[in-house]
Structures are given as structure tokens and as C-alpha cells.
Regions:
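Conserved PLP-binding active-site segment of the aspartate aminotransferase-like
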Residues: 111, 190-196, 213-253
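Structural signature of PLP-dependent enzymes
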Residues: 120-123, 144-166
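Catalytic cores of nucleotide-enabled group-transfer and carboxylate-activating enzymes in metabolic
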Residues: 79-80, 120, 138, 169
Length: 260
């Protein structure tokens, strides 16, 4: 079997189905609940379009990676593709890395019934590398209702953390130069900066001041196709007490440009 991988174009609603058709794809890996790094949440209409794409051919499948989906702060959660898939075309993937801890290293996969015989035939020998003790502990944690309570606490904590980070940015020296988007879900958002500097120069000048920036263009196969001056801000790990100093150092870049 030969596998050819490729990237597909995104629009405001997420993955372009027309791009899948043009590429002749049979399998697609997506994160419809909160795409990383763009933060796009795929609307219901596009999800239905994607399911119809999969159903047009007998061996098309969708790998739904629901990573980071548990943290939605505005509106009701959108149903997963797996939950509305009537044709058995969606393979669901998720992990506990965000909701509990990366060190737990436990993820899971839910197969459509039609794939179970093939899985048992081809991969029935597979044994998880995670210790049985950790798996059993997590199972008990969930079965006894503690996981849902923990998740609610984490949602509240990250909601407060997100609000604090955004308030600090909007009340700081970059308030007139920064536009925040895609902040309603997940543990990151985008921040577009008003600057004539190319991304590489902006990142270099920030690094000279001890501030590490993650540019959206770094995630593109073709960086030139990315919208310029957009930062990917993973706010969950930000030290809120150090953020004002980091923003002040970034503001120095504009001050130097204004006096150049």
C-alpha cells in the first residue's frame, strides 16, 4: 500500500471539501471542534458537507481528532462528526493530555462498527504501552464521576485565565496595535499585530528582548500564503505576572520603528 500525504486549503469554515476532491483524497485528518493553529470551529453545514464527501466513495474515511475540544467558552458545544455519522465513515480520536496532564500519555480511538473486524484481524495483537495501573485509575476516576467535575473546574479556570490574559493585552501598550480573534474555544487564540515588519524580523526582534513569538506563518507549508503578523498565543502556560513586562518589551519594537 502506498500512502501520499498532502495539505488541503482552509477557508473561514475550515477544511475545503473542494480541495479534497481536487486532490483525490480518500482519508482526511481534521480537528473540526477547534483547528490548531487557526482556531477555526467548523460549522454544522461544513461538517455535513464533509460527511457527504466521505459517503460518495466506499472506502473514504474521516479521522476526527477532537484534541482541545473540551474547552468551549461561548455557545453550546457542536456535536462531533462521529456522533452524527450514520454511514460509519468517522474514526474518532481524543486524548487526556489537555484535560488532565500531558504526562499521563493516554489517548483513545473509537471505531465505527464496520471497521472492528478489520482492526481485530490486523491489530488484535496490539497492547497499550501505558501501564495498567494508570489505565485502571483513570477508568475509576471517570466511572465515579470525578472526571466531569474536574473538567468543569478546568473550564472555569482556563476561562478566567483567558479573560485575564486578554484584559492584560487590551489594557497594555499594544492595545491599539493588537486584534484578538478565535478566542471562544480551546487554549489558544490568535493575535494580529499592526506592523509593517515581516514575520521573521518581528520574531527576531522579539527574541532579542527575551520574548519568544509563535507566528501563524510557521505552521503553513507555504509561509508566504499565511496572513502576516499573526501570533498563536497559547495562553494556558502564560505567567500572568510576567505578561505586562513581555508586552512592554514588544512595544519597544514599535517605539524604535516610530523613531527610525
Amino acid at each position: 500500500m502506498t500512502l501520499t500525504d498532502f495539505s488541503a486549503a482552509l477557508d473561514a469554515a475550515g477544511l475545503s471539501v473542494a480541495a479534497l476532491d481536487a486532490a483525490g483524497a480518500d482519508v482526511v485528518h481534521i480537528s473540526p471542534s477547534h483547528h490548531y493553529p487557526t482556531g477555526i470551529v467548523m460549522p454544522i453545514a461544513r461538517r455535513q458537507e464533509l460527511l457527504h464527501w466521505a459517503e460518495r466513495e466506499p472506502d473514504r474515511f474521516i479521522l476526527e481528532d477532537d484534541y482541545d475540544s473540551e474547552f468551549r467558552f461561548v455557545g453550546r458545544p457542536i456535536p462531533t462528526l462521529f456522533s452524527v455519522d450514520e454511514g460509519g465513515r468517522v474514526i474518532y480520536l481524543n486524548t487526556f493530555s489537555k484535560t488532565i496532564a500531558p504526562s499521563i500519555r493516554i489517548s483513545y480511538m473509537v471505531l465505527p462498527h464496520r471497521l472492528l473486524p478489520t482492526f481485530r484481524e490486523k491489530l488484535g495483537f496490539y497492547s497499550s504501552t501505558v501501564s495498567g495501573f494508570e489505565q485502571y485509575t483513570l477508568a475509576r476516576f471517570m466511572a465515579e464521576g470525578y472526571y466531569e467535575k474536574h473538567l468543569n473546574r478546568m473550564r472555569k479556570r482556563y476561562h478566567q485565565k483567558r479573560d485575564a490574559v486578554i484584559a492584560c493585552i487590551r489594557g497594555g501598550p499594544l492595545a491599539e496595535r493588537a486584534r484578538i480573534t478565535e478566542e471562544d474555544a480551546g487554549l489558544h487564540f490568535l493575535m494580529t499585530l499592526d506592523t509593517p515588519l515581516p514575520d521573521g524580523a518581528l520574531r527576531r526582534l522579539a527574541a532579542q528582548r527575551g520574548v519568544r513569538l509563535a507566528m501563524l506563518s510557521e505552521y503553513y507549508n507555504d509561509p508566504a500564503a499565511a496572513p502576516p503578523h499573526v501570533l498563536v498565543v497559547n495562553y494556558s502556560g502564560i505567567d500572568i505576572e510576567k505578561l505586562p513586562r513581555a508586552l512592554a518589551r514588544l512595544a519597544e519594537i514599535w517605539e524604535e520603528q516610530d523613531h527610525a
